[in-house]
């Protein structure tokens, strides 16, 4: 799967094009609606820059035959220590550092989006987000430092013999396990943050389902972090048997995929006009089953109509206002 240079380049370019389109549409939508740019927007641009860097690295690695090709030896085999493998290790270290930073920027962008949408109306959520944003920032910083210092003061041991690597870099694999586990946990928590808020909105059921589905696009990011974790764990267990370059290629490719998929997922809530048209038939079906009781009998015509674009919370401002109104009504009751 990973010894296909043309496929790796094509996949990298396609993901970059899709993320570029998503970020471009996000900004053009804001300019068209004359909305302000917030921290969440600039953070996603920073993540896109890191994603672009990872794409260039992937293509460069394939071009110099350090990624996407077989070397014929396992990563801990003394015969595998060649210039080709060392170049791949340099690329892999850059992938690790840029990948963690890019993923962290995506998470922070999503958290700041929640802040601008919901924090004003929800005091408890505001307090939680302050803590959560701090933890996410510390998560990224700590694992970037862990990547830089995985061999302590013997950084060159990463590119040395297996004996040197095992002697000086013993914490690298446990640190990697901790990173992929906490990455998944952070993605999952970030994904479910808006669910109680959206369920509490005083809007039509179909609108509520549609809004929820748009936020749950973030499940793509959770799925990619699970996949990357699986690839990392499987690769670390196969260091004695699997081809060295294939292991590094697989890890680098899923590092890139997680960042790019995260950017796409983070742009989802701000591309509601496009996604509304895509999800409307599905939400109509779900809502009709959800409310197939007395409400259907009393309002048959209402349930037969698809939600129009003007009826939906189609912008950040509308959704923030809807959240504020719902919280005010709940407080009044």
What positions do the PLM features span?
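Fungal low-complexity intrinsically disordered segments enriched in serine/threonine and acidic residues
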Residues: 314-333
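Extracytosolic/lumenal membrane-interface segments
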Residues: 1-320
């Amino acid at each position: 799967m990973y010894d296909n240079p043309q496929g790796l380049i094509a996949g990298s370019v396609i993901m970059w094009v899709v993320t570029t389109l998503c970020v471009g549409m996000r900004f053009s939508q804001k300019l068209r609606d004359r909305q302000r740019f917030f921290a969440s927007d600039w953070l996603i641009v920073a993540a896109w820059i890191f994603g672009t860097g990872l794409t260039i690295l992937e293509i460069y690695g394939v071009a110099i035959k350090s990624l996407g090709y077989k070397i014929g030896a396992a990563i801990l085999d003394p015969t595998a220590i060649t210039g080709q493998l060392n170049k791949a290790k340099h690329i892999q270290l850059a992938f690790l550092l840029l990948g963690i930073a890019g993923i962290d920027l995506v998470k922070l962008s999503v958290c700041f989006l929640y802040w601008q949408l919901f924090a004003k109306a929800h005091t408890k959520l505001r307090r939680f987000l302050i803590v959560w944003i701090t933890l996410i920032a510390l998560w990224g910083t700590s694992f970037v430092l862990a990547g830089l210092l995985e061999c302590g003061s013997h950084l060159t041991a990463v590119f040395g013999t297996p004996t040197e690597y095992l002697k000086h870099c013993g914490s690298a694999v446990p640190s990697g396990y901790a990173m992929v586990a906490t990455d998944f946990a952070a993605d999952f928590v970030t994904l479910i943050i808006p669910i109680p808020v959206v369920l509490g909105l005083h809007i039509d059921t179909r609108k509520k389902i549609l809004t929820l589905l748009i936020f749950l696009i973030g499940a793509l990011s959770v799925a990619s972090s699970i996949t990357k974790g699986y690839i990392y764990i499987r690769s670390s267990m196969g260091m004695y048997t699997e081809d060295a370059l294939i292991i590094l290629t697989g890890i680098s490719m899923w590092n890139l995929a997680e960042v790019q998929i995260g950017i796409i997922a983070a742009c989802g809530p701000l591309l509601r006009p496009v996604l509304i048209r895509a999800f409307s038939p599905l939400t109509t079906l779900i809502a009709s089953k959800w409310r197939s009781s007395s409400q259907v009998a009393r309002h048959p015509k209402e349930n037969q109509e698809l939600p129009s674009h003007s009826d939906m919370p189609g912008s950040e401002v509308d959704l923030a206002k809807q959240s504020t109104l719902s919280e005010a009504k709940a407080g009044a009751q």
